[in-house]
Structure formats: C-alpha cells, structure tokens
UniProtKB/Swiss-Prot annotation:
Region of interest (Disordered), residue spans: 1-23
Organism in which the protein naturally occurs: Schizosaccharomyces pombe (strain 972 / ATCC 24843)
Function: Required for vacuolar assembly and vacuolar traffic.
Full protein name: Vacuolar protein sorting-associated protein 41
Origin organism lineage: Eukaryota, Fungi, Dikarya, Ascomycota, Taphrinomycotina
Cellular component, GO annotation: cytoplasm; cytosol; HOPS complex; late endosome
Ranges occupied by WD repeats: 39-76, 78-117, 119-162, 166-204
Length: 871
C-alpha cells in the first residue's frame, strides 16, 4: 500500500507490507503529533530514549526533553552546531550530548546543572556510564574527528580525561553496556572491559569502501555476551565469552555475518529475531557517486529476520521527506521500558513499532472478517478487553453471515457462541423467523436439559407441518417431547390429517404423537394402516390383543416384511401364547391363504402344545411338505391323524419318494413300494433291506424275479440274499448262459456268509445247550420244592394231608411228588440229569423265557432247537 510523504498518521496509510495476504508481524503508530514542538519547528539530528523520557537533538544545537506522554519538559540550546549524539544513564537523570562544535555537555535533568567538556574538534559520538547517577567517578566516553577515544571522569583534583585509544581515525559510534564498551572507528570495532580496564579485542571491517564514513555504524547490546553490529550492507553478531579462570580476559569472536541487499540504518534485537531498518539503495550508489550529487532516497523498510536469517516480514515505512534523507538520517532505538517496543526516528517524523500481540492478532482477524478465528483467539486471552468481548464479536460474526445470506452457517455457529446464554440464543431464533429462515437454525437448537422455551420448538414444528411434512416427522422423532407440548402439536397434526388422510408421513407423525400422548389404541390403528412393525410392539406392550384379533393376516404380513427376525418370531409366539384372544380356528381361517404363515403358526403351536391341532392333520401335511421336508416325514412317522391317500398324493406331488415308500408300506402296498425303490430310487440295497424288514416270501420272489434280467442286481442279491432257501431259490432261477459281472466275487461272498452263519449257529448251540441244562435243573428244583409244616411228634402220624398238625413245633420240609401224589422228604428226591437233558419241553420253554424276545434271536433259537433235536 503506497503512501505519500505527507500522508496521515494512521497505521494503514503509513505502512506497506511486503505480503498483503499475510498477517503483519509488527504494528506501527506514527506519534509525531505528540512532539510537534520539536519535529514541526526543527529537524532532528540525534536522539535517545530512557524509561521515562524522549531526548531529541537538532541541527540547530537545541536539545528537547519530553515525557513519554508527549509533554515537553525542557528545551535547551547548549550547542552552536548540530547535535550529533545523545546518551542517557539508566536512571534517566543525566544526559550527555556532543556536537560538531567540539563540545561534550553533561546535563542533569532534575537540577539542570551542566558540565561542559570542550575538545576543540568535532565530536561524532558520546556514551555515558549507565550507572552515572550512582557512581562518584562520573565517567563519559567521547570520540570524533580527533582520532581518539577519551574517557572523561571526575577525579580528586577535578575532571580528567584518559585516552583509551589513539590514532584510530574517526570514532563514529560508542555504546556502553554494564561493564563493556564498544566503539566503531576507522580501525574497526573495538571492545573494552571496564572491569579489567583493558581492550578485549578488535574486529576489522569485512571490507573497505570509499567514503565509508557515509554509512553509519549501529551498535546494539542484546546482553553481556552478545553484541549486534550493523554497518554498510552487513549485520554482524559478536559473542563475548567470559572465562572460568580467574583474572583471565573474556574472549570475543564473530558468531555470524549477514549481508543484505540494502544499507543498514538501524539494528536491534526483538527476542530472538533481528529487527533492522533498511535504507533501500546499493552501497555502490554512495561509494561511486560524485560528492556534490545527492541520491534521492526511497522509503526505508523495517525487516524482521529470524535466528536462521530468514526474513519474516518487510514493511516499507512512509516517513516524512524520506526522499531527501540519507542512511545516517534514520535512527532505530529500543524502548527500555519494553523489550518488544521500538521507535523509528527521522529528522521530521517518529513511528512507534512493536510486535503484534494476541489482541492485535484478534483485531487483525476482525478486520479481515475472520470472526470464527477471532473468537477462538479471544477465548485464549488471559484478559479480554471490552472492545473484544465474545458477545460483541459473536453478534458481528452472525450479522456478517446473515448479510452474506449464509443462514445455515450462522445457525451452525450460534450454539457454540450462546450455549451459556439461552436468552440471546432465543432472540436469534426470532431473527431467523423474521427472515423466513427457521429451517436453517432448526437443526442446531439445544435439545438437552438446557433448552429454549417450548414456544420456539412449537413454532418451528408448526412451520415444518405447514411446509415440509417429512422434516416435521423427522423432528418429532429427533426432539425429546419435553421440548414442546405434545397435545398442542397433536391437535394441529390431527386437524391437517383430516384434510389429507392419504399422507403416510402425516399418518406416522400422528401415530407417534398419539403414542407419546398415552393413546396407544389410536396409535396402533394408524401404525397398522402404515404396515409398521411398531403395531406389533404396541400389542405386546399394551396388551392390545382384542384390538388385533381381526387383523392376524395383516399382522403376519407386516412381521414377514420386517427387518428384525425377533419381530417375526414375536408375532407367531404371541398368537400361540394368547390362544384365548386368538383362537386357532380363527387364526387358521385368516391365514389359510398364505401357506408360509400356516407353517410358522403350526411350528410355533407344536412347540408349546405338542400333538395338538390334530384335526388339521392333512393341512399340516400340505404346509410341512412345502416348507420343511424333514418335519413332513417326522409328522408322517409320529402321528396317525391324517389320510394315507392324501399323504401319498402329496408325496407324489412333490416327488418325495422316500416318504412315499413309507406311506405305501403303511397302506400294505409293499410290492408297489418295492417297485418304487427299484425303479425310481434305483437302490437295490435298500430294496433288499426293505424285503428283509417285511419278512414276506412273496416279496422275495418278486425281487428275485425282477432281478433275473439285470446282472448287476443278481450279483447284489447274491451278496446280500441272507438265508439258504432264498439263495437256492435265486440260483435256481438264473437263466442258463447269463453273464454275471464279478460273479466269482459274489458267489464267494455268498458262501462265506453261509459259512459264517453255520459257525454262528453252532456257537449258539453250544452256548444255549449248557444254558438250557442249567435252566432246566433250576426249573426242576423250583417245581419240586415244597412247603414247611409243623407236625406233632407222634410215631403214628403218616404223611397224609389230613394227619398234619399245625401246632407241632418241629419244622420238617416236605415235598409233594406229582408222580406219586405223596409228600416226601427232600433228601429222598434224586435228580436225574439225563432225564432233564431229555426233557425237551422243559429246556425249550425255560430257555425261551430267559432270552430276549427279538425276532432274529427267536429265529436263531428255533434253528438251534431244530439242530439239537436232530442230534
């Protein structure tokens, strides 16, 4: 941003940044008006700043002393020529000045006493002891064209001068910091220690230039260990390192050297950054120019350079009359009262410079209308100034967005800005309402415990009800009902519903409001109309079984389309668990047209009431056959409450051959079942097993006859034929010349099976023989055992029944012999083993009673007894 030399004092008009898009690093303020008596009526040639005062020296030899607030304390005319340099002590009580008239004058600001040192030669620089006011030595350094650095001090007999360095050419600049002094002369930079009273070292200029006295030396002490030097187009950083050895001099060294593209008119440190006042010109412009020719100057730039020598910013400063100024006419001085403040001073202007702080950052963001960032930055401030209160910034921010038509964005930021101020929050809602943009703020209304008044939410719901039924329904489900009056919104919704009952969205909204207003029956009928799963939940939660009794089919349809499997099972369970409200006859009648529902109902009913609803046996067969073949077969096997003909018809309909075989078997159509196994299932092994299970000789004959023209079947029969009789029958019927595959293997297996059977029978015979004898003996003993009687001890008694006396106390075991029909003693009974062995009836009967009555075991026992009798 370019400015004219006579522009106003405002920051914007005075400063031009090198990058307009970036936030400035420094802030500027022209304060020339505070010192009008000096800058308007005179031209400044020298200056100094203390914690309390500004000191200005003019080309007319006058010295001005101002307070920081711009009040002129004193004007002193002490010199007859231009004041070249000023230096003030730390207490701001004593001021040293030097002039081209060769005089150095020390002035006491409070007492107005002055001490004059006349060196008879033009002086260029002066430096007063920082602790001049507290030390009795009263030391001041000066130097100039005489080529000497002179230390003037107060001695026992008066003032005395001590030459610290002679024959050094012109002395351009002297700077005193605590116990260190640095001066710049034609020989370079010399560093002196007042503690040791010795020169620590000298740095020669990196290069020699013609007319090098044109370029002012800049000396700035950042600390006792660092000195920053500016000269020509170079910036040097010098390090002073104290020794750990006693009485050893500190060592100085050049730490860094930076060359810039302009002339250094001032340099100092702002924190860890270098602040330099750059005179925009090439060094060669001054070293090669004709002495009488004056170079027109450009606006100087104030540049901030970091520790890695990267330029952070560069701002051109539009000082008054800058085109007629030379590099030595500018001064860059730090403010002793603040490390972040400094001043740029020219003969006719003064600009206050400081680093931008957080408040400046916020103001910059506001100026760029970056309100969101500004508000975030304000929240981090330890103290918020009145002009930057969040409420004010928030108001500006929202009006800024509204002015740009960004209502949605404005509604989005309001919650974060007014979360703790619900009254202001609510006012913004009405602002949106006035501009017909309620929908842009509705999504951001608070819905928790800290919420707005019900009127706000009802107003927005009414707006949506009139313009957007879908969003109205969405808000009803999103917002807690505590935010608004449910009855009020329900009545408004019901009124519109009566006008348009075809709207599913409006129906859902009204059902929701009925439910929230504790009217579940009305809500149920509306949800049922919408085919919503919620109607099933309402039945279960509010016991609306009587209301649902006539709508079973519709409820089943709703549950079948539901996404949740729990809803489907819940519906079937409800119908079964509440049979008093849902009689099975009515349920079956309603859902009869949908076999899937019948299947689910029958399955659920069977779980709770096994072997029930037998009157619907044929209907169960229909649905089980369609949806669950395993359950269909289980039902065929485990129940009898169905028509066999109907079952056979279903099996044929669905081509359930295994089930059809079972049904044909139950119907007595064994031959048809056998043919089904052979012709349809093509399973000769199963056919053989089926014939064995039926134990029907005619079936064997049919199977053998059917297999005679099928060599593969013949071989399979030979391997699994079983009894000798069937095997003989099969072998005898095989047509001569029939070629049988792997016949040898089949015959070998047949013979091996026959041999195994013979061995089995023989083993069983041996086992049963011994067991038969043992059982026969035991049976004989049981049959011949008698009862114990008491008889009198009378020799005339015999063993007749009529002669027994039960009062006799002697116990004598008696056995009644069936053969002789008499009672005998046990010891007189002789068991003849051979007789027992020959008693076939007893052995056979007792063995039969001892064995398990399985069919196969009975057959084997018959075979065993047959073989036994033949032996």
């Amino acid at each position: 941003m370019s400015v004219d030399e006579s522009n106003s004092d405002s920051e914007i008009d005075s400063i031009s940044s090198s990058d307009e898009d970036e936030e400035p690093k420094l802030i500027y303020e022209r304060i020339t008006e505070k010192f009008q008596g000096c800058f308007m009526n005179d031209t400044i040639s020298a200056c100094a700043i203390s914690k309390e005062h500004f000191f200005f020296g003019s080309h007319n030899g006058a010295i001005y002393i101002y307070q920081k607030n711009g009040i002129l304390l004193r004007k002193m005319i002490l010199h007859s020529a231009s004041v070249v340099d000023l230096s003030v002590d730390l207490e701001s009580e004593n001021l040293a000045s030097c002039s081209m008239d060769g005089k150095m004058i020390i002035s006491n600001i409070t007492t107005r006493e002055t001490t004059v040192h006349d060196f008879k030669r033009p002086l260029l620089s002066v430096a007063i002891d920082p602790y001049y006011s507290t030390r009795s030595s009263r030391q001041v350094l000066s130097g100039g064209r005489a080529g000497k650095v002179v230390l003037s001090e107060k001695g026992w007999l008066g003032n005395k001068d001590t030459v610290l360095q002679a024959d050094c050419g012109a002395v351009y600049k002297i700077s005193w910091y605590t116990t260190y002094i640095a001066w710049a002369s034609d020989l370079g930079i010399t560093v002196y220690s007042t503690e040791f009273g010795k020169v620590l070292g000298r740095l020669e200029p990196p290069k020699r230039l013609p007319n090098d006295e044109i370029f002012p030396y800049q000396l700035f002490w950042q600390s006792e260990s660092r000195l920053v030097i500016g000269w020509s187009d170079q910036i040097m950083i010098v390090s002073i390192q104290r020794s750990n050895v006693a009485n050893e001099l500190p060592k100085i060294s050049l730490q860094a050297l930076l060359e810039i593209d302009s002339i250094v008119s001032g340099v100092l440190m702002l924190g860890f950054n270098i602040l330099t006042l750059a005179y925009i010109a090439n060094v060669e412009d001054f070293t090669s120019a004709i002495p009488s020719q004056r170079i027109e100057g450009c606006r100087p730039e104030l540049r901030l350079i970091d520790s890695s020598f990267k330029e952070l910013c560069g701002d051109a400063i539009g000082l008054a009359n800058y085109s007629r100024l030379q590099p030595s006419d500018y001064h860059l001085l730090p403010d002793p009262s603040s490390n972040s403040h400094s001043f740029v001073i020219s003969p006719n202007d003064i600009v206050y410079v400081r680093e931008r702080n957080q408040i400046d950052h916020v103001k910059y963001l506001v100026s760029k209308e970056m309100y969101a960032e500004a508000i975030d930055a304000v929240k981090k401030l330890p103290e918020i100034p009145p002009s930057l209160q969040i409420s004010e910034l928030a108001k500006k921010y929202i009006f800024h967005l509204l002015g740009k038509g960004q209502y949605k964005e404005a509604g989005m930021v309001i919650p974060s800005l007014y979360n703790d101020n619900l009254a202001e929050w609510e006012q913004w809602v009405f602002v949106f309402a006035e501009n017909d943009h309620l929908e842009d703020i509705a999504d951001f209304l608070p819905t928790g415990e800290n919420h707005l008044s019900p009127l706000v939410y009802e107003m927005i719901l009414a707006q949506y009800l009139a313009t957007d039924e879908r969003t109205f329904n969405k808000k009803l489900h999103e917002w807690p009902t505590m935010l608004y009056s449910v009855s009020t919104i329900r009545n408004a919704t019901l009124k519109k519903f009566k006008e348009n009952q075809k709207s599913s969205t409006l129906t859902e909204s009204l059902a929701f409001l009925y439910l929230e207003d504790n009217m579940p029956i009305d809500a149920f009928h509306l949800y049922l109309k919408l085919h919503s799963e919620l109607c099933i939940d309402l039945i279960l939660q509010h016991n609306l079984y009587d209301e649902a009794r006539a709508s079973v089919l519709l409820l089943m349809l709703i549950s079948s389309k539901g996404k949740s499997s729990d809803t489907k099972s819940a519906m079937s369970s409800m119908l079964v668990q509440h049979v008093h409200s849902f009689p099975p006859q009515e349920v079956i009648m309603q859902i009869h047209s949908v076999p899937q529902f019948l299947y689910e109902y029958f399955c659920e009913f069977e779980l709770m009431y096994p072997n029930s609803l037998m009157e619907y046996g044929d209907l169960k067969l229909d649905v089980f056959a369609e949806f669950d073949r395993k359950r269909f077969f289980d039902f065929l096997v485990n129940t009898q409450c169905y028509s066999l003909d109907h079952a056979a018809q279903i099996c044929k309909q669905y081509n359930y051959l295994d089930e059809l075989v079972y049904i044909l078997g139950r119907m007595g159509n064994n031959k048809e079942a056998l043919m089904l196994i052979i012709n349809e299932l093509l399973d000769i092994g199963r056919a053989i097993r089926y014939v064995k299970e039926q134990a029907d000789r005619e079936l064997w004959d049919d199977l053998i006859s059917y297999s005679l023209d099928k060599p593969e079947f013949i071989c399979t029969l030979l391997e699994n034929i079983g009894t000798d009789e069937n095997a003989r029958n099969l072998l005898s019927k095989i047509p001569p010349g029939t070629k049988l595959p792997h016949m040898k293997k089949s015959i070998s297996k047949l013979l091996a099976d026959h041999q195994s059977q013979v061995q089995l029978y023989q083993s069983c015979y041996k086992l049963f023989k011994n067991e038969s004898i043992s059982m026969a003996i035991k049976y004989r003993e049981q049959e011949q055992s008698g009862l114990e009687f008491l008889v009198k001890d009378n020799p005339f008694n015999s063993f007749g029944d009529e002669q027994l006396d039960y009062n006799y106390r002697k116990r004598i075991p008696m056995i009644y012999d069936l053969r002789t029909k008499k009672y005998i003693r046990p010891e007189d009974v002789r068991i003849d083993t051979d007789d027992v062995f020959k008693d076939d009836k007893i052995a056979y009967f007792k063995t039969r009673m001892h064995l398990k009555p399985e069919v196969q075991m009975r057959n084997k026992l018959d075979l065993l007894m047959m073989l036994y009798k033949q032996t």
